[in-house]
Amino acid sequence: MTNRIRVAVVFGGRSNEHAVSCVSAGSVLRHLDPTRYEAVPIGITPQGGWVLANSDVAAIGLSHEALPSVDAGGTALTLTADPTRGGELVALDDAGAVLGTVDVVFPILHGPFGEDGTLQGMLELAGVPYVGPGVLASAAGMDKEFTKKLLAAEGLPVGTQVVLRPGTATLTEEQRERLGLPVFVKPARAGSSIGITKVDDWAALDTAIAAAREHDPKVIVEAGIVGREVECGVLEFPDGRISASVLAEIRMPEGDGPQFYDFDTKYLDDVCEFDVPAKLDDDIAEQVRELAVRAFQALDCQGLARVDFFVTADGPVINEINTMPGFTSISMYPRMWEATGIDYGTLVSTLIETALARGTGLR
């Protein structure tokens, strides 16, 4: 087993999706094939410190009572950015011992300082292959403003939005008329539906903007879209083929339950129902799958992405793209691929082998 590929599974991070990242990493570690891969779990603390984690991370779960976090008590380390040193992990103690090398990184990080191109840029400098899109696609996919601008430039269907930059307090009357009600107020660069508010009355707008700005100084206000919420997974294979999964539909509970698919609904509360595959007409489903691949290519993604849609009476509309979707046991991305015929373990192996085949640098 000495020829196994050493895979650094990097998780945690400085974003408000730290806990979800920890749980995703636990699922990935549980499904790594031990005959092919040697796992090197590396946690990033909420303060940004890198530590060598232990195998207990594979048992991490998520609940109202316990949101997991990376403990700073592990061996502090860094990944050298010198590409001539072959992915060396160096201890941050007085001795500066080399703790070994890694062949590839699986950066199962969600949100800023991990999914947004920052870590990807560091890995490019280090010359270490990594799972997922590169710097440009990661940065653009993290920022809802530029995601929609790039997709719209390629002629893909997107919803109406207004960007509130730092220093812009609220919407103008003209913008309110253009958007209509309801609107969704979101941090521009956050995921897992954190900081999102549905606004049905303009009197609540400023409070919603303030809530979003707790997570990001740049805020997006999106026009509400009436339609079915559908997701599609996109996967790149080592030979360069790009495929779309079967679709998943999220069905929100009727009555007094949550009004949209928020953080608690996604990860903590068992209140939504899911259809995998989604019960859509074949022609609509195929249209969504084709749009998902086009969105993947429009942002120059590699490896994987999850593309979220609203299927309206006038056709599908792209809501957003996730360049490192959740990998928890209940996450839609692995569930969609399992329904397509690729189980979790094979999915993880495919992503790693695609990263190794792609390498780093201009391509």
Swiss-Prot record:
Necessary cofactors: Mg(2+); Mn(2+)
Residue positions binding Mg(2+) 1: D308, E320
Pathway linked to the protein: Cell wall biogenesis; peptidoglycan biosynthesis
Alphabetized GO MF terms: ATP binding; D-alanine-D-alanine ligase activity; metal ion binding
InterPro entries: ATP-grasp (IPR011761), ATP_grasp_subdomain_1 (IPR013815), D-Ala_lig_Van_CS (IPR000291), D_ala_D_ala (IPR005905), Dala_Dala_lig_C (IPR011095), Dala_Dala_lig_N (IPR011127), PreATP-grasp_dom_sf (IPR016185)
Domain ATP-grasp, first and last residues per copy: 148-353
Enzyme class (EC, first level): ligase
Transmembrane segments: none
Family annotation (HAMAP family): Dala_Dala_lig (MF_00047)
Protein name: D-alanine--D-alanine ligase
Organism whose genome encodes this protein: Nocardia farcinica (strain IFM 10152)
